[in-house]
Structure formats: C-alpha cells, structure tokens
Amino acid sequence: MESMEQPLHVVGAILLQGDRILVARRAPHKSAPGLWEFPGGKVEAGESPSEALEREILEEMGLTIKSLKTLDVSDTLVGEREIRLEVIVCELLTDFEGFSSDHDEFLWASKDDLPSLKWATPDLPAVQQLLGFDNLSDLLRYSSDR
C-alpha cells in the first residue's frame, strides 16, 4: 500500500494596520510569480506554526511579529502537492520598511481591495474568511477572544 505524502505545512501572516492588511506579491524568481499572498513560509520540523511564522517574517522581511490566533487552516492541491496553509492573525511589533527577499511589491490592502487581487490559490480560503468581517480591524478583537 502506498503511503500518502503529508501536506506541505506553510504559514501566512495577517499583519494589520488599522483596517488594512499587508499583502505581498510573489517575486519573479519564486513559484507562482506575480500572485498575491499573506507573507510567511514553511513550518520546519520541531517548530510550532507560530514559531515558524515569526522566524520566516523576521528572515524574509526583517520584521518582529507576535502570533495571536489562527484565522484559517485549509488544504489546497497545487500541481501534485498538497499545501496546508495556516493563516495567523499577528501583531506587528516593528515598522515595515518595504523589504522582502521573496516579494517584489506590497500593499496595505483594505477589505474592498482583496477581491480584485490575483491571489495564490492556497490563500483564497483565508481571503474568503476576511471578507466575512465587517471591518478588518475586527480581527484584533477576534484575536483576543481566546
């Protein structure tokens, strides 16, 4: 009997500034170039999703964040690989300077901006979750309801 390959576990950050979320466009040298996503990366062996996200955001963007609460976990088949994306609402602890090793453009997106962006497929379920909030700033209230 063949063993099923485990999904690739990746994490993405919901970084809020008022009622806007920082979204990032994948750079030309990355897979799915030109598509928008929530910045993040792979969960390494022995890491919690929160630890992985805090490490990835620091490595790629030079930002210090604090993970607050998971917004969405969904599995998406991309080519022949299943991607499990866990999107986590985070607090941004340092100012964003506009740098990332994996992205070529950034946008502080309003809720109204989200549907018009061309998203990486694994991020779409979380985008749908976000569209269900009256105001994106409500995510912080949602995050503190532990």
Segments and roles (model prediction):
Residues 26-29, 119:
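Short coil/turn segments
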Residues 8, 74-97, 107, 111:
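Active-site-adjacent beta-strand/loop module that shapes the phosphate/pyrophosphate-binding cleft
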Residues 5-8, 69, 99-100:
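Short solvent-exposed loop/turn micro-motifs enriched in small/polar/acidic residues
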